[in-house]
């Protein structure tokens, strides 16, 4: 990370805090200033931290135009007026002095991704000392901090970024702060409230969408979440060391935009809006699920094969499927396979982005190369090793073509050369194993096509899938292929599908329902702030206040709705009702169906609830004779910790040491 204009910490914030506490002792006499806008600001509606992805900051849009015309990022904001913060808190900066020094006595600094290989830059004109400085505005004040920027990934592995912030002197007196407010206009961004306790850059943050009119951002510290890649640390306002803003881009495109920030104010806890009752505690609504044995019976011999080889499986997660996941070393290896086998698991699914090993992939897609070439030494070092180890420990093996970079998407899905690249990749892998005598080796075409967006249609995905099936069958007619539908291996889409004519295909679904339970606390989801949702739904553990479960003003409406309706979805029977649709389709078409992803994050739920959920899933699969593979081995969905099966999973999943 490249830092500019980084000055020593100063303790003015601590002094200002003490003065505020001394002068204003009655914490109940001050209302939240955001609820008392100045005259003329009636249409300036406060927004709270949004859990939307801050991926691409939009190109700058003229707010007066109905078209998406790009305008000069330095265009003077004309809306106003905005409110001036007053109360028991502390003004961080209103920028009215027009210089680089904040009201808390420290200077504004900037940073970017250049030291990590990125090419992002801040393009705002600097002063003579090369410091970022406020720009003129017409929003009821004279100045706001103006940052123009270009987000360019360059050679950086992840999303490009630029940022700017101000240091804060950690102080015990700062513990009375409960939130932050500021006004902004411009691109999507994150606000980072950095504390000294975090040592791995997994900072506490909130996300806000782009706005082409002035909006007030309201951040309650109780709603902050961490990025999710580092150690979880409780937020403590006494340890605040910096307040910064970050514009984050997209790996796939160049973004030019701007952001104006004004009137940054640390709120006293008494000024922070409190949660209010907004739900009812209802009795659970349990669906009645009925079916006959005939409705779920599959006589196809592949059903027996699936139950024999693909039941009680586990995914190796967060490794070779990553965008930067090309093999470097065996982060997971033979000892891990042995641990799984010793604990009663029968199948290993290896997510791996196969096309990362095509050495001329881009040239082939561009049409300049007509033959796809591979780094076979690396690719088959990995695959052959796991073929050997799984055979040694009597586990089946699934090669799962799995793309976290979302390179198969609505654009590439229409590119014949891209489809040919995927087909040739599978042909290459299948040819390598064509003579393998193992009948428990499986080829999974592509995990959750268009994984990030889910916008590729079933028909479009069928075209690509058929091309891969045909390519595999030119070299290998023996090994079974696994196919899942578009939209994240959708049950709904599969239930509408006509099976392929190839009679050696097993069909796959994924399910993480109820999502409000399984993904609570997931930093990459719209449920990032959600916590303590129980499974199953229990009125005795419910509340009339959705805020007790982490719902806040930024929580998306569909998430709020899902939580309010959880009394209808938080049961084993509700899950069964959905999975049964896939099983009935499978029985009707006499083809097997499996589940090779399900699981629950261990971030914000109790161990008891997770065991209840896993027990329900295993019982459903046993009842419907559906083989299952859990996501995943380690990490936040783990079944193994410190080399041992997590307590209670032996009974929940019907596994365990022999």
From Swiss-Prot:
Its EC number is 3.2.1.4. GO terms for molecular function: beta-glucosidase activity; cellulase activity. Residues 87-277 form the CBM11 domain. It is a lipid-anchor. A lipid is attached at residue 24 (S-diacylglycerol cysteine). GO terms for biological process: cellulose catabolic process. The active site is at 448 (proton donor), 597 (nucleophile). This is Endoglucanase 3. It comes from Fibrobacter succinogenes (strain ATCC 19169 / S85).
């Amino acid at each position: 990370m490249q830092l500019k204009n980084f000055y020593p910490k100063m303790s003015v914030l601590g002094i200002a805090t003490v003065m505020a506490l001394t002068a204003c002792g009655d914490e109940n006499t001050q209302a939240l200033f955001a609820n008392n806008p100045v005259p003329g600001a009636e249409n300036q509606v406060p927004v709270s931290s949004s859990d939307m992805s801050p991926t691409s900051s939009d190109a700058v849009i003229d707010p007066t135009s109905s078209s998406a015309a790009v305008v000069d990022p330095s265009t003077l904001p004309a809306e106003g007026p905005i409110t001036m913060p007053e109360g028991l808190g502390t003004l961080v900066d209103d920028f009215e002095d027009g210089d680089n020094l904040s009201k808390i006595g420290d200077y504004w600094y900037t940073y970017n991704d250049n030291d990590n290989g990125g090419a992002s830059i801040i393009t705002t004109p600097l002063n003579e000392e090369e410091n970022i400085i406020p720009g003129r505005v017409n929003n009821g004040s004279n100045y706001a901090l103006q940052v123009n920027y270009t987000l360019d990934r360059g050679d950086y592995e992840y999303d490009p970024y630029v940022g700017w912030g101000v240091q804060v002197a950690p102080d015990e007196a700062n513990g009375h702060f409960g939130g932050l407010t500021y006004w902004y206009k411009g691109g999507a961004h994150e606000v980072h409230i950095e504390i000294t306790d975090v040592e791995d850059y997994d900072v506490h943050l909130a996300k806000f969408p782009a706005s082409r009119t002035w909006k007030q951002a309201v951040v309650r510290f109780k709603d902050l979440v961490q990025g999710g890649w580092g150690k979880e640390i409780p937020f403590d306002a006494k340890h605040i060391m910096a307040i910064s803003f970050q514009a984050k881009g997209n790996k796939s495109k160049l973004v030019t935009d701007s952001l104006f920030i004004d009137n940054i104010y640390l709120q006293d806890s008494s000024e922070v809006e409190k949660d209010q009752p907004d739900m009812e505690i209802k009795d659970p609504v349990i669906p009645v699920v009925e079916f006959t044995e005939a409705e779920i019976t599959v006589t196809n011999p592949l059903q027996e094969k699936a139950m024999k080889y693909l039941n009680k499986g586990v995914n190796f997660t967060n490794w070779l499927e990553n965008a930067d996941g090309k093999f470097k070393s065996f982060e997971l290896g033979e000892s891990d396979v042995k641990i799984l086998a010793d604990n009663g698991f029968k199948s290993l699914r290896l997510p791996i982005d196969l096309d990362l090993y095509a050495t001329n992939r881009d040239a082939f897609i561009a049409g300049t190369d007509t033959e796809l070439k591979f780094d076979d030494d690396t690719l088959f070092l990995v695959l052959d090793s796991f073929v050997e180890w799984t055979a040694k420990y009597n586990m089946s093996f699934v090669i799962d073509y799995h793309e976290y970079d979302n390179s198969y998407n609505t654009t590439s899905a229409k590119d014949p050369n891209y489809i040919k690249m995927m087909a040739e990749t599978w042909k290459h892998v299948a040819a390598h194993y064509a003579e393998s005598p193992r009948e428990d080796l499986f080829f999974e075409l592509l995990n959750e096509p268009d994984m990030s967006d889910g916008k590729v249609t079933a028909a479009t995905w069928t075209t690509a899938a058929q091309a891969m099936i045909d390519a595999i069958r030119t070299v290998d007619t023996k090994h079974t292929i696994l196919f899942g539908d578009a939209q994240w291996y959708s049950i709904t889409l599969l239930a509408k599908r006509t099976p392929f004519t190839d009679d050696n295909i097993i069909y796959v679904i994924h399910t993480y329902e109820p999502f409000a339970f399984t993904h609570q606390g997931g930093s990459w989801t719209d449920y990032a702030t959600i916590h303590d949702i129980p499974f199953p739904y229990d009125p005795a553990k419910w509340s009339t206040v959705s805020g007790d479960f982490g719902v806040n003003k930024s929580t998306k409406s569909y998430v709020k709705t899902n939580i309010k309706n959880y009394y209808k979805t938080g049961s084993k029977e509700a899950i069964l009702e959905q999975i049964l649709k896939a099983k009935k389709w499978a029985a009707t078409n006499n083809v097997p169906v499996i589940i090779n992803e399900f699981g629950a994050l261990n971030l914000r739920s109790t161990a008891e609830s997770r065991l209840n959920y896993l027990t329900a899933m295993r019982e459903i699969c046993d009842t419907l004779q559906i083989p299952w593979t859990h996501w995943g081995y380690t990490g936040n969905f783990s079944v193994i910790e410190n080399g041992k099966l997590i307590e209670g999973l032996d009974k929940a999943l019907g596994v365990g040491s022999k």
